[in-house]
């Protein structure tokens, strides 16, 4: 089971009373991998509001009547009325926000009583990758974690371990706290390992001594993958929070 399938499972996709569609906001949906896992897992009807800053979701999901693309800046309040959603998934969002606690509080606002927020983040400082040079790998990972890439405004390589502290931003109930580290044996473009390697190259680019060593390091990863010796993992942290149910009348 991969990351997105785990998130779908943690979302507890129970059909609401009366059989209406489960209303879900998938924040920073990207290509739609979490949305796809939710559609495959849900036992009943769902409506996914796929929220991102740009329309990069896969074409088949873009045209799926169960998916509603929403363009929004996640530093702004979420584009939903109060208490209209059953589930919110926030995956690798918090590190890029000006105020992660405000984000969690706003997720609380849009959830119905009894609704769930699945707050998940990779903790990039836990990156494990096979290589020929342990010392260089440690140095490059540290550089990657400490550097904000030029293509984003903010980053925090330690965000995974900070998620539980964000839960106090609103009067949520903590349902579960989980960690896992998926094992990746391939170094394909757009894989998590490939994205980390790209981040390493960007972080080292301005260091005349380190940049060529980083390039050689990535070439080593490709060689390891070709030889069947490549291994990559990073710890993911997932905190499931519930907006308390409304008191009985």
Each language-model region and where it sits:
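Conserved alpha-helix/loop element of class I SAM-dependent methyltransferases that forms part
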Residues: 1-21, 37
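Class I SAM-dependent methyltransferase SAM/SAH-binding core
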Residues: 25, 31-77
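A short acidic, Gly/Pro-enriched loop at the edge of an enzyme's catalytic core
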Residues: 76-88
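C-terminal helical/coil "lid" or tail adjacent to the Rossmann-like core of SAM-dependent
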Residues: 176-231
């Amino acid at each position: 089971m991969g990351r997105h399938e785990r998130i779908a499972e943690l979302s507890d996709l129970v059909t609401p009373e009366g059989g209406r569609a489960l209303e879900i906001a998938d924040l920073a949906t990207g290509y739609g991998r979490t949305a796809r896992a939710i559609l495959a897992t849900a036992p009943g009807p769902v409506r996914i509001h796929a929220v991102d800053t740009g329309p990069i979701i896969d074409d088949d999901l873009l045209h799926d009547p169960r998916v509603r693309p929403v363009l929004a800046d996640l530093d702004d309040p979420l584009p939903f009325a109060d208490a209209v959603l059953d589930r919110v998934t926030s995956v690798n969002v918090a590190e890029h926000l000006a105020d992660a606690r405000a984000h969690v509080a706003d997720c609380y606002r849009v959830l119905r009583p009894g609704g769930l927020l699945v707050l998940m983040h990779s903790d990039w400082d836990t990156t494990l990758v096979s290589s020929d040079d342990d010392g260089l790998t440690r140095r490059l990972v540290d550089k990657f974690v400490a550097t904000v890439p030029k293509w984003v405004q903010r980053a925090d390589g330690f965000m995974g371990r900070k998620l539980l502290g964000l839960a106090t931003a609103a009067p949520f109930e903590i349902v579960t706290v989980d960690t896992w580290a998926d094992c990746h044996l391939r170094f394909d473009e757009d894989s998590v390992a490939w994205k980390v390697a790209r981040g390493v190259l960007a972080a080292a680019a301005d260091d005349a001594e380190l940049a060529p060593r980083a390039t050689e390091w990535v070439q080593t990863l490709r060689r390891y993958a070709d030889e069947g010796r490549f291994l990559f993992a990073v710890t993911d942290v997932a905190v499931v929070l519930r907006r308390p149910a409304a008191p009985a009348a």
